[in-house]
């Protein structure tokens, strides 16, 4: 009798994706983050669902409904903080996942990579809209500042902003639609993630060497299922340490003050995972220029396959490119720090230098380093 998992139409899909999938024998822990992102997404959808049962998307009651969740709903506080800090864990995994792709040349899987970039944009949009929902000071002013950036678009800008707001300022209509979008987007992300996997399984996984591993494959189960479970346990441990011991560590104290359109907070800044992009935005004195730089800072990932000049796929055996990569990581950390600082000397100039360096490293230094390595190896 043939096995049901190999014959049943639904089980066959699961089997080919998670059980009998041929996987390279040498993929390291950097390959764990895909499954961790899946776990983060499921966790966010579940906690978000329970939060939505008690949340009201009205400007008069939104803030107090979140307070009610934390005070009166059974285990509401843990659901709320798991959702808020779950977003941080989500972005940590996302950044490491993208970094892994850059380091090991996974961007040569074009469809998988491009859908990944779309996923990154969708996740950033979801997180931004979710941050607006508690309707604290930083929620309101963050929404005002970021949506206002669209007014920099020539000719249609002002109309576009008012269309998104549903009025002449961030108000009830804005909050309601942000809640609607925040609810639907994670399901779109889940669908996109399945397409992401579909394209990945067309080619098979990359591995640290960047060399074809067709000659040496092992079944995904039990080898990588057990490895993913270990990763998941560590992820949940990190998340619960954050939730139970320092739930407000990554948040902004201003968001515990109800939104007040008449009182601007001294320093408007987004959540930590957007600070690098926010620093790039602020480092350009022109509004439209800043918005373009902001979008390009993420969209530049699409160009990675075109900028790949090396004869080798991975950076594993390319010391010069490795140095450039880690300088880029340091630059992004610098930008993250600058994004959280006030707009004054010396932070302005540091931010501008770090922003220039970010684009230079990706567009000029990395391809040059690759070409130098090719020449050194007489290729």
From Swiss-Prot:
Keywords: Electron transport, Heme, Iron, Membrane, Metal-binding, Mitochondrion, Mitochondrion inner membrane, Respiratory chain, Transmembrane, Transmembrane helix, Transport, Ubiquinone
CDD domains: cytochrome_b_C (cd00290), Cytochrome_b_N (cd00284)
Binding site for heme b b566: 97, 196
Xref: Gene3D superfamilies: Cytochrome Bc1 Complex, Chain C (1.20.810.10)
GO cellular component labels: mitochondrial inner membrane; respiratory chain complex III
Residues reported to bind a ubiquinone: 201
GO molecular function, one term: ubiquinol-cytochrome-c reductase activity
Cellular compartments annotated: Mitochondrion inner membrane
Top-level taxon of origin: Eukaryota
Co-factor requirement: heme b
Cofactor descriptive note: Binds 2 heme b groups non-covalently.
Predominant place of localization: mitochondrion
InterPro entries recorded: Cyt_b/b6_C, Cyt_b/b6_C_sf, Cyt_b/b6_N, Cytb/b6-like_sf, Cytochrome_b, Cytochrome_b_C_euk/bac, Cytochrome_b_N_euk/bac, Di-haem_cyt_TM
GO terms (BP aspect): mitochondrial electron transport, ubiquinol to cytochrome c
UniProt: heme b b562 binding residues: 83, 182
Membrane topology, record value: Multi-pass membrane protein
Parts of the chain that traverse the membrane: 33-53, 77-98, 113-133, 178-198, 226-246, 288-308, 320-340, 347-367
Further facts: Heme 1 (or BL or b562) is low-potential and absorbs at about 562 nm, and heme 2 (or BH or b566) is high-potential and absorbs at about 566 nm.
Quaternary organization: The cytochrome bc1 complex contains 11 subunits: 3 respiratory subunits (MT-CYB, CYC1 and UQCRFS1), 2 core proteins (UQCRC1 and UQCRC2) and 6 low-molecular weight proteins (UQCRH/QCR6, UQCRB/QCR7, UQCRQ/QCR8, UQCR10/QCR9, UQCR11/QCR10 and a cleavage product of UQCRFS1). This cytochrome bc1 complex then forms a dimer.
PANTHER family: CYTOCHROME B (PTHR19271:SF16)
Its biological purpose: Component of the ubiquinol-cytochrome c reductase complex (complex III or cytochrome b-c1 complex) that is part of the mitochondrial respiratory chain. The b-c1 complex mediates electron transfer from ubiquinol to cytochrome c. Contributes to the generation of a proton gradient across the mitochondrial membrane that is then used for ATP synthesis.
Family: Belongs to the cytochrome b family.
The protein's name: Cytochrome b
């Amino acid at each position: 009798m043939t096995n049901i998992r190999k014959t049943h139409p639904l089980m066959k899909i699961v089997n080919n994706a998670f059980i009998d999938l041929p996987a390279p024998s040498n993929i390291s822990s950097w390959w764990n983050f895909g499954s961790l992102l899946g776990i983060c997404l499921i966790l966010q959808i579940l906690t978000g669902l329970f939060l939505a049962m008690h949340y009201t998307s009205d400007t008069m009651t939104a803030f107090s409904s979140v307070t009610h969740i934390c005070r009166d709903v059974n285990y509401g506080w843990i659901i709320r903080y798991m959702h808020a800090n779950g977003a941080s864990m989500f972005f940590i995994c996302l950044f490491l996942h993208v970094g892994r792709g850059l380091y090991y040349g996974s961007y040569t899987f074009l469809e998988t990579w491009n859908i990944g970039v779309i996923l990154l944009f969708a996740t950033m949009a979801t997180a931004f809209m979710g941050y607006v929902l508690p309707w604290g000071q930083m929620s309101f002013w963050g929404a005002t500042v970021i949506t206002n950036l669209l007014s920099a678009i020539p000719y249609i800008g002002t109309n576009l902003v008012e269309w998104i707001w549903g009025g002449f300022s961030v108000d009830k209509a804005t909050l309601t639609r942000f809640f609607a979008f925040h609810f639907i987007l994670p399901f779109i992300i889940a669908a996109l993630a399945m397409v992401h996997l579909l394209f990945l399984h067309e080619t098979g996984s990359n591995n640290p060497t960047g060399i074809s591993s067709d000659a040496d494959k092992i079944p995904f189960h039990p080898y990588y299922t057990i490895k993913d479970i270990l990763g998941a346990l560590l992820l949940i441990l990190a998340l619960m340490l954050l939730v139970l011991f320092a739930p407000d560590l990554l948040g902004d104290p201003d968001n515990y003050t109800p939104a007040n359109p008449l009182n601007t907070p001294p320093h408007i800044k987004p959540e930590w995972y957007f600070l690098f992009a926010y620093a790039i935005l602020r480092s350009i004195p022109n509004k439209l220029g800043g918005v373009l730089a902001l979008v390009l800072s993420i969209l530049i990932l699409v160009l990675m396959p075109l900028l790949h000049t090396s004869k080798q796929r991975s950076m594993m055996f390319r010391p010069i490119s490795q140095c450039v990569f880690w300088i880029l990581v340091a630059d992004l950390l610098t930008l993250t720090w600058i994004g959280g600082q006030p707009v004054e000397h010396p932070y302005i100039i540091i931010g501008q230098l770090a922003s220039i360096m970010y684009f230079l490293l990706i567009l000029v230094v990395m391809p040059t380093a690759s070409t130098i390595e090719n020449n050194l190896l007489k290729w």
